[in-house]
From Swiss-Prot:
The keyword Cell cycle applies. Keywords: Cell cycle, Protein kinase inhibitor. This is Cyclin-dependent protein kinase inhibitor SMR14. Transmembrane segments: none annotated. The gene is SMR14.
Length: 154
């Protein structure tokens, strides 16, 4: 005969508790205990709060069961020669889910050194030549032209 290995999955204690108490996961909302003297609007709000609280509890129980029972299950190999226990671990138990890194930022535009150097070298000086021009044309000469000469500003 050829060697045949048989594997059996043995549940953890938490799995057994969950299978024995399925009503803990599904809890119907009962509004019989509400006082009849309360207004209808108040009763609706209170029942909504109870439902939300129950849903949160159910979600927490499910998460605890799923997280706790994943890594604790064991596979057992029944072989004639050597019984071996192999712990089952989830695929991504050691790795932590990280958000992807942000894309690199676009660098700010820096004016090139060539252009900046040109502005530094060109020390531009604006000269006020209005006085020199007026000195070239005295007021006595301007009266002869009939005030046809006008000052222009740049």
């Amino acid at each position: 005969m050829s060697k045949i290995k048989i594997f059996h999955l043995f549940p953890d204690d938490k799995d057994i508790e969950a299978t024995q108490q399925p009503e803990s996961l599904l809890v119907p909302s009962k509004s019989d205990s509400l006082d009849s003297s309360l207004s209808r609007h108040h009763q609706e709000n209170q029942s909504n709060r109870q439902r939300n609280h129950q849903h949160r509890q159910q979600d927490q129980e499910l998460e605890n069961l799923q997280d706790g029972s994943r890594g604790k299950r064991k596979w057992e190999c029944k072989d004639e020669e050597s019984p071996v226990k192999i712990p089952e671990t989830p695929r991504n138990s050691n790795s932590v889910c990280y958000c992807p890194p942000r894309p690199p930022r676009k660098p700010k535009a820096i004016p090139s050194m060539k252009r900046r150097g040109m502005w530094v070298k060109r020390s531009v000086v604006f000269l006020d030549v209005a006085r020199e021009v007026e000195s070239m044309f005295p007021p006595s000469v301007l009266q002869d032209f009939g005030k046809k000469i006008k000052k222009a500003r740049f």
